Protein backbone atom coordinates (compact mmCIF):
# COMPACT_ATOMS: atom_id res chain seq x y z
CA UNK A 1 0.00 0.00 0.00
CA UNK A 2 1.64 3.19 -1.16
CA UNK A 3 -0.06 6.39 -0.06
CA UNK A 4 1.15 9.78 -1.23
CA UNK A 5 2.69 11.83 1.58
CA UNK A 6 3.71 14.84 -0.49
CA UNK A 7 3.35 17.76 1.99
CA UNK A 8 1.56 19.88 -0.63
CA UNK A 9 -1.17 17.23 -0.99
CA UNK A 10 -1.79 16.47 2.70
CA UNK A 11 -4.10 18.35 5.04
CA UNK A 12 -2.32 21.02 7.06
CA UNK A 13 -1.27 19.62 10.42
CA UNK A 14 1.04 21.12 13.01
CA UNK A 15 4.70 20.46 12.28
CA UNK A 16 6.14 18.09 14.82
CA UNK A 17 9.85 17.52 15.17
CA UNK A 18 10.47 13.87 16.12
CA UNK A 19 12.42 13.21 19.29
CA UNK A 20 15.37 11.02 18.31
CA UNK A 21 16.50 8.34 20.72
CA UNK A 22 18.38 5.12 20.04
CA UNK A 23 16.26 2.02 19.60
CA UNK A 24 16.68 -0.44 22.41
CA UNK A 25 17.28 -4.13 21.84
CA UNK A 26 14.11 -5.96 21.03
CA UNK A 27 14.69 -8.86 23.42
CA UNK A 28 13.03 -7.14 26.41
CA UNK A 29 9.64 -8.76 25.94
CA UNK A 30 8.84 -12.36 25.11
CA UNK A 31 7.49 -13.02 21.62
CA UNK A 32 3.72 -12.76 21.27
CA UNK A 33 1.69 -15.94 21.83
CA UNK A 34 0.76 -18.01 18.78
CA UNK A 35 -2.61 -17.20 17.20
CA UNK A 36 -5.62 -18.91 18.74
CA UNK A 37 -7.14 -19.96 15.42
CA UNK A 38 -5.55 -21.27 12.28
CA UNK A 39 -7.35 -19.28 9.58
CA UNK A 40 -8.51 -16.08 11.27
CA UNK A 41 -5.27 -14.74 12.71
CA UNK A 42 -4.87 -12.13 9.96
CA UNK A 43 -8.40 -10.78 10.33
CA UNK A 44 -7.41 -7.76 12.42
CA UNK A 45 -4.54 -6.83 10.15
CA UNK A 46 -6.42 -7.08 6.87
CA UNK A 47 -9.96 -5.95 7.67
CA UNK A 48 -10.26 -2.33 6.56
CA UNK A 49 -11.97 0.40 8.56
CA UNK A 50 -14.44 2.76 6.89
CA UNK A 51 -11.64 4.47 4.93
CA UNK A 52 -10.36 1.14 3.59
CA UNK A 53 -6.97 1.45 5.28
CA UNK A 54 -5.21 -1.48 6.97
CA UNK A 55 -5.10 -1.45 10.75
CA UNK A 56 -4.07 -3.40 13.81
CA UNK A 57 -5.36 -3.42 17.36
CA UNK A 58 -3.52 -3.49 20.65
CA UNK A 59 -4.94 -4.28 24.07
CA UNK A 60 -2.92 -2.04 26.39
CA UNK A 61 -0.82 -4.05 28.83
CA UNK A 62 1.55 -3.02 31.58
CA UNK A 63 4.48 -3.44 29.18
CA UNK A 64 3.03 -0.74 26.89
CA UNK A 65 3.04 1.74 29.76
CA UNK A 66 5.89 0.88 32.12
CA UNK A 67 8.84 1.23 32.31
CA UNK A 68 9.84 2.01 28.71
CA UNK A 69 6.51 2.81 27.03
CA UNK A 70 6.92 0.78 23.84
CA UNK A 71 4.24 -0.31 21.40
CA UNK A 72 5.17 -3.51 19.58
CA UNK A 73 3.77 -3.91 16.05
CA UNK A 74 2.06 -7.31 15.61
CA UNK A 75 3.95 -9.61 13.24
CA UNK A 76 0.80 -10.13 11.15
CA UNK A 77 0.82 -6.37 10.33
CA UNK A 78 4.55 -5.89 9.74
CA UNK A 79 4.42 -7.13 6.14
CA UNK A 80 2.34 -4.03 5.29
CA UNK A 81 5.14 -1.68 6.36
CA UNK A 82 8.36 -0.86 4.55
CA UNK A 83 11.56 -2.40 5.88
CA UNK A 84 13.64 0.68 6.67
CA UNK A 85 17.34 0.41 7.38
CA UNK A 86 16.91 2.11 10.75
CA UNK A 87 14.53 4.36 12.66
CA UNK A 88 11.77 6.04 10.67
CA UNK A 89 9.55 8.95 11.69
CA UNK A 90 5.94 8.10 12.48
CA UNK A 91 3.04 10.31 13.54
CA UNK A 92 0.07 9.26 15.67
CA UNK A 93 -3.16 11.26 15.29
CA UNK A 94 -5.96 11.03 17.85
CA UNK A 95 -8.62 13.43 19.08
CA UNK A 96 -7.48 16.24 16.80
CA UNK A 97 -3.91 16.18 18.13
CA UNK A 98 -0.71 14.67 16.76
CA UNK A 99 2.31 13.02 18.39
CA UNK A 100 5.66 12.38 16.73
CA UNK A 101 7.08 8.96 17.41
CA UNK A 102 9.63 6.62 15.87
CA UNK A 103 9.07 3.34 14.08
CA UNK A 104 11.96 0.94 14.70
CA UNK A 105 11.71 -1.21 11.60
CA UNK A 106 15.20 -2.64 11.68
CA UNK A 107 14.60 -4.74 14.81
CA UNK A 108 13.30 -8.30 14.79
CA UNK A 109 10.28 -7.16 16.80
CA UNK A 110 9.12 -3.92 15.12
CA UNK A 111 7.89 -1.20 17.48
CA UNK A 112 6.91 2.42 18.05
CA UNK A 113 9.48 3.87 20.41
CA UNK A 114 10.33 7.52 21.10
CA UNK A 115 7.17 9.58 21.47
CA UNK A 116 4.90 6.67 22.36
CA UNK A 117 5.23 7.61 26.04
CA UNK A 118 3.88 11.13 25.41
CA UNK A 119 0.95 9.67 23.46
CA UNK A 120 0.17 7.16 26.24
CA UNK A 121 0.45 9.76 29.02
CA UNK A 122 -1.43 12.54 27.19
CA UNK A 123 -4.28 10.15 26.38
CA UNK A 124 -4.26 8.68 29.90
CA UNK A 125 -4.03 5.12 28.60
CA UNK A 126 -4.61 2.45 31.21
CA UNK A 127 -4.09 -1.29 31.28
CA UNK A 128 -7.19 -2.80 29.68
CA UNK A 129 -7.78 0.03 27.20
CA UNK A 130 -7.50 -0.83 23.51
CA UNK A 131 -6.08 1.14 20.60
CA UNK A 132 -6.88 0.73 16.91
CA UNK A 133 -3.96 1.91 14.75
CA UNK A 134 -5.16 2.73 11.23
CA UNK A 135 -2.37 3.24 8.68
CA UNK A 136 -3.46 6.42 6.87
CA UNK A 137 -0.21 7.35 5.10
CA UNK A 138 3.07 5.69 4.22
CA UNK A 139 5.67 7.77 2.41
CA UNK A 140 8.21 6.57 -0.12
CA UNK A 141 10.96 7.46 2.38
CA UNK A 142 9.34 5.25 5.02
CA UNK A 143 7.45 7.86 7.07
CA UNK A 144 4.25 6.51 8.62
CA UNK A 145 1.02 8.10 9.82
CA UNK A 146 -1.52 6.32 12.00
CA UNK A 147 -4.98 7.47 13.03
CA UNK A 148 -5.47 5.99 16.51
CA UNK A 149 -8.86 5.24 18.05
CA UNK A 150 -8.84 4.68 21.80
CA UNK A 151 -11.39 2.31 23.30
CA UNK A 152 -11.61 2.63 27.06
CA UNK A 153 -11.71 -0.64 28.93
CA UNK A 154 -10.45 -1.84 32.23
CA UNK A 155 -12.10 -3.47 35.18
CA UNK A 156 -14.83 -1.88 37.30
CA UNK A 157 -13.48 -0.17 40.43
CA UNK A 158 -15.21 -2.67 42.72
CA UNK A 159 -13.13 -5.56 41.37
CA UNK A 160 -9.76 -3.82 41.16
CA UNK A 161 -7.65 -5.32 43.93
CA UNK A 162 -4.26 -6.91 44.26
CA UNK A 163 -5.78 -10.08 42.79
CA UNK A 164 -4.66 -10.75 39.27
CA UNK A 165 -1.21 -9.28 39.68
CA UNK A 166 0.36 -12.74 39.81
CA UNK A 167 -0.66 -16.22 38.73
CA UNK A 168 -0.83 -17.18 42.41
CA UNK A 169 -3.73 -14.73 42.90
CA UNK A 170 -5.90 -14.99 39.78
CA UNK A 171 -9.10 -13.06 39.18
CA UNK A 172 -11.97 -15.54 39.00
CA UNK A 173 -14.94 -14.77 36.78
CA UNK A 174 -18.02 -16.77 37.72
CA UNK A 175 -21.08 -16.98 35.46
From Swiss-Prot:
One of its GO terms (cellular component) is nucleus. It comes from the Eukaryota. Gene3D superfamilies: DNA-binding pseudobarrel domain. Residues 56-154 bind DNA. InterPro entries: B3_DNA-bd, DNA-bd_pseudobarrel_sf, REM16-like. One of its GO terms (molecular function) is DNA binding. Keywords: DNA-binding, Nucleus, Transcription, Transcription regulation. It is found in: Nucleus. Residues 1-45 are annotated as: Disordered. SUPFAM superfamilies: DNA-binding pseudobarrel domain. Disulfide bonds: none annotated. It holds the Pfam family B3. Its main location: nucleus. This is B3 domain-containing protein Os06g0112300. It comes from Oryza sativa subsp. japonica (Rice).
Amino acid sequence: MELDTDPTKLKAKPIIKPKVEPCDDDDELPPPPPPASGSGEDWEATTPLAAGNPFFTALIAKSHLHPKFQMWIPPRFQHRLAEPEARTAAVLHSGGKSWATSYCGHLKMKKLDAGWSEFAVDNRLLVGDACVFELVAMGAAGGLEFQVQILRGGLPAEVVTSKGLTSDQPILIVD
